[in-house]
Amino acid sequence: MPADSFAALGRRGFVMTSLMTGFTLAAARADAAPIHTDSRGLVVGEVQMPVADGQLPAYFARPAGVTHPPVVIVIEEIFGVHEYIRDVCRRLAHQGYFAVAPELYARLADLSKMTDPQEIFTQVILKAPDATLLSDLSHAVDWAIAEGGDAGRIATLGFCRGGRDVWLFAEHEARLKAAVAFYGPVAGPTSAIQPRNPIDMAAELRCPLLGLYGGQDPSIQPADVYAAAARAKAAGQTVDIVYYPDAGHGFHADYRPSYNRADAEAAWARALAWLRRYDIG
C-alpha cells in the first residue's frame, strides 16, 4: 500500500484498541443459542499484532504444548472479532490449528458500539482500503510464524465479507496453501480504495480454494461465483464450489436468524477436510 495511504490512516488513529466482548449488537438474535467452545487444552488470548502503521488487536487460539502447529488466518464478517469469530478460532484450535483473527476495521470504528449493519457497511467496510486489509492479513501470517506457527502450513478461512476477502487474500499471499470462503461476494461495485473484485483477480489465485454458498442467498449471484471459479481453473488452480440449496446468507453463523444447523455442520466438516487435503493439519 502507498505510504501516504497508511499515513492517512495513522493520523486518524486506531479507534478500537481491544476486541469486543460477547456477540455483535448488529446481528445477534435474542433467542439464539450459539455454540460455545471451551478453551481447555488451548492457549487463547488477545494480542496487539504489529502491522505497517502500528498495532492491530487480534484474537488467537492454539493447542497447548504443540510445536509448530499449522496456521489458519480467520477473516471476520462485517461485525468484527466478536464471540462467534473467537469461537471459530477455538474450534480450529481443538482441531490442531493456530487460529488468528485480526480486527481488520480497528482503524475506522469500534464495531461493538454499532447496531445497524447497513451503517457498518457504508461507513466502515466500504472505507477500508483493500491494500491495507491485505497487508494486515499478511502481517497476521508473520506474527503467527514468529509465535511458533508452521511457516509451511498456512491457510485462511473467512465468513460473509470475510469470504470475499479470502478470495483476495488467496490471490495476494504466496504463503497460503489452502483457502476456504464461507459465502461472500465475488463481484460488485468497485472504488479507488477497493479497485478489484475477486472475480477480476481469479486467474491470480495462488492456492486451492473451497467456496461454500447458500442457494437461498439473494446477495450473491451463482453465475458470478462459477465465473470466478472458471477463471481460476483456466489458469491452472484448484477451486471447488459447493452450494447448499436450502441455506441462506450467513448459514454458518449460529448467533443469527440465518443459521442452518445441518448445512453449517456439513460445510464445516467439508472445510476441515479441505484443509487436511492440502496438508494443513
Give the residues covered by each predicted segment:
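N-terminal secretory signal peptides
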Residues: 1-9
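N-terminal cap/lid segment of alpha/beta-hydrolase-fold proteins
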Residues: 33-64
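N-terminal export leaders
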Residues: 9-24
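Short beta-strand element of the alpha/beta-hydrolase
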Residues: 68-77
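Short beta-strand/loop motif that positions the catalytic acidic residue
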Residues: 205, 211-213
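Primarily recognizes the serine-hydrolase "nucleophile elbow" in alpha/beta-hydrolase
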Residues: 139-200
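C-terminal catalytic histidine-bearing segment of alpha/beta-hydrolase fold enzymes
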Residues: 236-281
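Gly/Ser-rich "nucleophile elbow"/oxyanion-hole loop immediately N-terminal to the catalytic nucleophile
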Residues: 115-155, 280
